[in-house]
Design a protein with these regions (language model features):
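Intrinsically disordered, low-complexity, charged terminal extensions of DNA damage-control enzymes
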Residues: 1-59, 171-186
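Catalytic cores of DNA base-excision repair glycosylases
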Residues: 49-186
Length: 186
């Protein structure tokens, strides 16, 4: 025999409990918003090169480094880097970026082209960066080989295992191989 329950037959406390999703509870938000603990927190300072790549400055904050790779995708550094610094001033963390209105982010990105797509990508990426269990950033929305290689080279000291395809990353990677003994890199 099947029993159909209506709101009248369910105790009021059960109905009230359902109205509050875990998503909105402060306990859930605190846990979700803390950055994932990963290899990125091992001590590794990539050496400064003659190429002065933006990754050499942002290695200490993987989210910012990965945001830079989104900015640099199909855009010259000369155009992207000034807008990147402006973006990071307004949106200094994944928590702030994931809560942003994509239209505001899009307006900031207009000089770079693909601004609506990039804005939505940045917001979704920032959310996944905080909430998804990931090992490498290529698992996150908007991050491809370039972003993944940058993370592995500059954030977690896996430069020996990486074979970059980007010309600037290749220059840095080749420079590391040429100088790793002199720089005492393992």
């Amino acid at each position: 025999m099947m029993c159909i329950l209506s709101e009248d037959t369910i105790p009021r406390t059960q109905i009230e409990k359902r109205k509050t999703s875990l998503y909105f509870s402060s306990k859930y938000n605190k846990e979700v918003l803390s950055p994932p603990r990963r290899k990125a927190f091992k001590k590794w300072t990539p050496p400064r090169s003659p190429f002065n790549l933006v990754q050499e400055t942002l290695f200490h904050d993987p989210w910012k480094l990965l945001i830079a790779t989104i900015f640099l995708n199909r855009t010259s550094g000369k155009m992207a880097i000034p807008v990147l610094w402006e973006f990071l001033e307004k949106y200094p963390s994944a928590e702030v970026a994931r809560a942003a209105d994509w239209r505001d982010v899009s307006e900031l990105l207009k000089p770079l082209g693909l601004y609506d797509l990039r804005a939505k990508t940045i917001i979704k990426f920032s959310d996944e960066y905080l909430t998804k269990q990931w090992r490498y950033p290529i698992e996150l929305h908007g991050i491809g080989k370039y972003g993944n290689d940058s993370y592995r080279i500059f954030c977690i000291n896996e430069w020996k295992q990486v074979h970059p395809e980007d010309h600037k990353l290749n220059k840095y990677h080749d420079w590391l191989w040429e100088n790793h003994e002199k720089l005492s890199l393992s």
